[in-house]
Amino acid sequence: MDQSIQVNINEVNQALERKDSLDVIKWAYKTYGDKLVYACSMGAEGMVLIDLISKVRPDAPVIFLDTDFHFSETYELIERVKERYPKLQLKLVKPELTPEEQAETYGDRLWERQPDLCCKLRKLVPLEKELAQYDAWMSGLRRDQSPTRTNTQFVNEDRRFGSTKICPLIHWTSEEIWMYIELHQLPYNDLHDKQYPSIGCEYCTRPVKEGEDERAGRWSNTSKTECGLHQ
C-alpha cells in the first residue's frame, strides 16, 4: 500500500509566504504529483485556478461535485471549460442517491427542511469518497470572500477529510479575479452578470444585494454559511 505524502504545514507556509499563486501551484504538483486533485465549484475563482493549473499541469485531474441541483448555466460552463482545456481530466462526481431517491428516502425539498443533511448527502459524502484516492486537494478559497475564510493559509490541514488543502488564491481580491478573467478572456458562468457572485445549487442560491458580502446569497434564509467542505 502506498504511503501518503506528509508535509510540515507551518514550515511550508513560511517558505511560500512571499510566493505568488503560480509558485504555490508548482510546489503543490512537485510535492504531490498525481496524488493532488482540484475540487472546482466552477465559480469565478475556479476559472482562474483552472487556467493557472493548465500552465503547470495541463492534464491535471479536476473534480466537480454534480449535486444534480445546479443551474443550467453551470452545466453550460462545464462544456465551455472542456472545450478550452481539452487535456484537463474533468470528472463530475455524483451522489449515491438520485434526486428522486433522496426525496423518497428523506422527503421532498430536503434542502429547505434540513440543508446540512442535503449538503452532506450531495456534496460531503461524495467528496470524501473521491478525496480518499488523493493525499491533497486544491481549492479556490479567498480570504476576503467571507468572515469564515479570513484565516485560510496557502497550505492547510484538513481535519474534515483527513487531507491537506491547498489554496493558491487566498490573497486575491474579487477585482483581481475579474481582471484576470477579462485579460485572458476566460469562460465564466453567465449568472455572474446577474448579481450572483457566488453560485451553488439552484435551490439555495439567490442574487446578492448591494452592500452584502459575496456569499450572502448562499442559504440566505438560514444561519448556514458553508456547505461543510471548508469547515
From Swiss-Prot:
It catalyses: [thioredoxin]-disulfide + sulfite + AMP + 2 H(+) = adenosine 5'-phosphosulfate + [thioredoxin]-dithiol. Its main location: cytoplasm. Binds 1 [4Fe-4S] cluster per subunit. Its EC number is 1.8.4.10. Keywords: Cytoplasm, Iron, Iron-sulfur, Metal-binding, Oxidoreductase. InterPro entries: APS_reductase, PAPS/APS_Rdtase, PAPS_reduct_dom, Rossmann-like_a/b/a_fold. One of its GO terms (biological process) is cysteine biosynthetic process. One of its GO terms (molecular function) is phosphoadenylyl-sulfate reductase (thioredoxin) activity. Signal peptide: none annotated. It comes from the Bacteria. Pfam families: PAPS_reduct (PF01507). The active site is at C227 (nucleophile). The keyword Metal-binding applies. Its cofactor is [4Fe-4S] cluster. The keyword Iron applies. HAMAP family: CysH. Belongs to the PAPS reductase family. CysH subfamily. Catalyzes the formation of sulfite from adenosine 5'-phosphosulfate (APS) using thioredoxin as an electron donor. This is Adenosine 5'-phosphosulfate reductase. The gene is cysH.
